[in-house]
Amino acid sequence: MAKRDYYEVLGVSKSASADEIKKAYRKLSKQYHPDINKEAGADEKFKEISEAYEALSDPQKRAQYDQYGHVDPNQGFGGGAGGGFSGGGFSGFEDIFDTFFGGGGRQQDPNAPRQGSDLQYTMRLKFKEAIFGKDAEIEIPREENCDTCHGSGAKPGTTPEKCSHCGGKGSINVEQNTPFGRVVNKRTCQYCNGTGKEIKEKCPTCHGKGRVTKTKKIKVKVPAGVNDGQQMRVSGEGEAGINGGPNGDLYVVFVVIPDEFFEREADDIYVEVPITFVQATLGDEIDVPTVHGKVRLKIPSGTQTGTTFRLRGKGVPHLRGNGTGDQHVIVKVIVPKKLDDKQKEILREFASTTGDKVDEQTSGFFDKMKRAFKGD
C-alpha cells in the first residue's frame, strides 16, 4: 500500500512554514496519541503523523522529499552507504577521469577495511522525559560479523578464493558507447559483488554473507533538555565494519509527545491559566502548575486577560548545562456564563459608577464582554 503524501497527513500545504507544520503536528499528535485516543487505528495514525513530521520538520529531509517524493533513512548521517545516484554511467569527476585516462589512478582495494553503516533509531519521549532526561534501553536490529566464519563467509576450514571474473579487483571494465565515442567504464563485478572473492563452500550459518542480523540491546542516557527532532550519536553502535573496519554509529532521533497543558518553545515553557473576573479585578494568589512542581503566583488587581507573568528558572534545563529556561504564565479571565438577577444587578450598579451604559436587551452586554475578554 502506497504511503500518503506527508503534507496531506499533516493537513498543510506544500508551502507551509516550519511553524505551521509544527502546530499541525502538535494538534494531530494530541488527537491521535494512543494514551489519549483508544479508537481502532489511532496508533497507526499517530505513527503516520510522527513519520510525516520527522521528514518535514528537518529542512534537509523536507528538501529531499519535495524533490524525490521520499526520504533516505540515512540522510544526514555520514559513514553509511552513501546517498545520491548509483548504478551505471558517471558517478562523479573521478569516474569521468577514469573513463578518459584509463581508470588506473583510482583503483581501490576491495578488501581494505571499511567502516560499517550508520543506523537511525526514533525514540518517542513523553514531554517531561525530554525535559529531565532518562535512562533507556533500546533494541536495535543490526548486521554483525558471523561468529561461525568470523566474517569470511566461507565454511569453517576453508577460505575464500580470488574471483575468477575480476581477478580479485572487485570491478570489471565495460565498453560503452557515448556521444564522445566508445569508452571504457568501470563497474562493480556482479559475480563477487565487489569483494574480489569467490566462496566455493559457504558458511552454513550466514550462507556466504559473512554477516548476520542480530538484535542488540543498547543502554542510552537521554540528556535533560532534548527537544523534538534533535538527535544524539552513540559512537560505535552502528553496523559492524567490513574487512576489520570500525563499526558505524547509531543516531537516536527524538520525537517528543506534546503535553495537553504545557507548551514548549526552545527552553521556555508557556501555559494558559484561567482566573475569575473577581480575581482579575481585586487581585489574588493562585497555584500554578510547572514541570518542577506547584508554584504560588500573585495576581495584581486590575489584571487583564492575556497578561503574561514570568516564573524564572521554571522552564527546561539547558541541554549543555548552565542554567534553566523560564515558564511564562498567560492568564485568561473567565467570564461567568450564567448569572442570577442579583448578580446582574450588582454588575449594572458597578457599570453605572464607571459611566458605562448597560442595556442587556439591545446591546448584548454580556456577550460583548465575553468577546472582549477572549480577544475577539
From Swiss-Prot:
| InterPro entries in the cross-refs | DnaJ, DnaJ_C, DnaJ_domain, DnaJ_domain_CS, HSP40/DnaJ_pept-bd, HSP_DnaJ_Cys-rich_dom, HSP_DnaJ_Cys-rich_dom_sf, J_dom_sf
Where Zn(2+) 1 binds, per the record, is at: 146, 149, 203, 206
Q: Which family does it belong to?
A: Belongs to the DnaJ family.
What organism does the record attribute this protein to?
Listeria monocytogenes serotype 4b (strain CLIP80459)
Residues of the J domain:
5-69
Q: Which protein is depicted?
A: Chaperone protein DnaJ
Q: Which GO terms describe its biological process?
A: chaperone cofactor-dependent protein refolding; DNA replication; protein refolding; response to heat
* CXXCXGXG motif repeats mapped onto the chain: 146-153, 163-170, 189-196, 203-210
Q: Where are the zinc fingers (CR-type)?
A: 133-215
Quaternary structure (record): Homodimer.
Domain topic, free-text comment: The J domain is necessary and sufficient to stimulate DnaK ATPase activity. Zinc center 1 plays an important role in the autonomous, DnaK-independent chaperone activity of DnaJ. Zinc center 2 is essential for interaction with DnaK and for DnaJ activity.
Q: Which UniProt keywords apply?
A: Chaperone, Cytoplasm, DNA replication, Metal-binding, Repeat, Stress response, Zinc, Zinc-finger
